[in-house]
Amino acid sequence: MKNYRIGLIPGPVRIPEEIKSAWQNDYGSSDLEEEFFTLYRENQSLTQKLLHTKNDIVITSGEAMSILWASLKCTLRPCGKLLAVSSGLFGEGFAEMAGTLGVNAEICTFPYDEVPDPQKVYDHARIFRPDVITAVHCETPSGTLTPCLAEIGRAAREFGALFVVDFVSSAGGCELDADECNIDIGLLGSQKVLSLPPCLSISSISQRAWEIIRGVKYSGYESYLGWENVPRQHFMPYTPDWHAMKALNISLNMIMREGLTSVLERHEEAAKLCRELGREMGLKLFPKSEGISSPTVTAFYVPENLTWPELDASLRAKGLAVGGNYGSLSGKVFRIGHMGSQADLELVREGMNIIRSEIMK
């Protein structure tokens, strides 16, 4: 397997040496020892600060898709109704996933290069009256950031729906106040801004959501049941990953030492530099306007004189790895990940200079 000197894919991101150190030690029995539960509680508290929430934090093993499934299976009955707010691949994915559960799922859809219109979402919810509304904060394949979570959250509250938000690739790198947005279940992955491998999934869960979860009683592997009182009852539904939990603790403390405001500014500066350099070399931004671009990832059209496989191969030959794309964007749009450890001006500048050298041959 080849290692790339300059990693700018939009997750999993480069892992800092300080975080890697968590895997250099041996730990005890994580589901029995007080030391582990103390670490778990500290990570809960630090994550609440990161997300600006008082809601419960649940930290489970596995990649973030596991909690996207959990957020649906634990809150929807087969006769339930879900409204997926979609301006991209992952927004659509919520509806597709719900459909496999026998749920009545509708999509309030918007073009991939735009963001949701909160009035259209409100009107759709008023007529449909869903049990759950889902939204995606950062559509990573599109490089867009949804600015209207608070408006959608108010609509969800008005119509009695739970509000589920995928902020896997935005939390910690973008302005986000989960409680202000009335987010009932928020979904975060470890491999983006937190700069870990894809080993942990983190959910913020409101009391409203817990009531629904207890009523639905889904008990499969991804279930939130059993996690509500983990620190108090000193019991885990399965053996947790102590190494990953320690790595998460290191990551969260690194963020807090730097300061949340400074971390957000660092992401904004890296994004701004990436787009400025892209403009200078003639790259076209995929989002319709720079104002809806995410601070954590930038999506550019592949230059017309190149194919994506050609460009990707030439960049990798120079030691640079960036992100391709999925679905209808595959081969047409590529992405620069400047999140977490990669929100670094020198790293972004070096990577963009290599892109310049290859597209301007």
Q: Which residue ranges define each predicted feature?
A:
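A glycine-/small-polar-enriched, mobile loop at the entrance of the PLP active site in fold-type I
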Residues: K2-S61
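PLP-dependent enzyme catalytic core of the Aspartate aminotransferase-like
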Residues: R5, K332-K361
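Active-site C-terminal subdomain of aminotransferase-like
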Residues: R14-I15, Q191-E276
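Conserved active-site segment immediately N-terminal to the catalytic lysine
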Residues: D179-Q191
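Conserved PLP-binding catalytic core of the aspartate aminotransferase-like
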Residues: K284-L315
